[in-house]
């Protein structure tokens, strides 16, 4: 196949359309996410898609599943519980690194060599979900990790790896 011309797909599948539409944005509408959109976003990020085995939408190295997804809003921060598909309150106050209706913080244990890779996989799920549903996001490494670690009540080697402000396009 060396030297053969490759053809661009016709974007007939939902996945191909999401890939075509994926872009980063840092400007968001002030419109809040609906509960359904927030629920779907969390599930797409790292939810359980095979209840019989507990396996997730995002693969992870050696199936460690150590990425924790925190949801930060203007009112407070919550930990996503994939087993129950619920948000558990962590703290009050606004700690969003970039002002969007919601900011997802991807946390892993730095004692694992795989945390950054696993965070990247979850990040891609978030980006593709947003592109496929017409929502806006940008994966970011820039954040005050020490302040987030304190606000999210992280322990030991847990640290924020990436954050995803999410909202609707402005």
Where are these regions (language model features)?
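Conserved acidic residues
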Residues: 101-102, 161
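Short, surface-exposed helix-loop/turn micro-motifs enriched in polar/charged residues
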Residues: 61, 139-140, 156
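Solvent-exposed coil/turn segments that connect beta secondary-structure elements
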Residues: 46, 74-76, 109-111, 143, ...
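N-terminal amphipathic, basic helical "cap/leader" segment at the start of enzyme domains
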Residues: 1-100
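Flexible, active-site-adjacent loop/turn segments at secondary-structure boundaries
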Residues: 17, 26, 31, 85-88, ...
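A glycine-rich helix N-cap at a beta->alpha junction
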Residues: 153-170
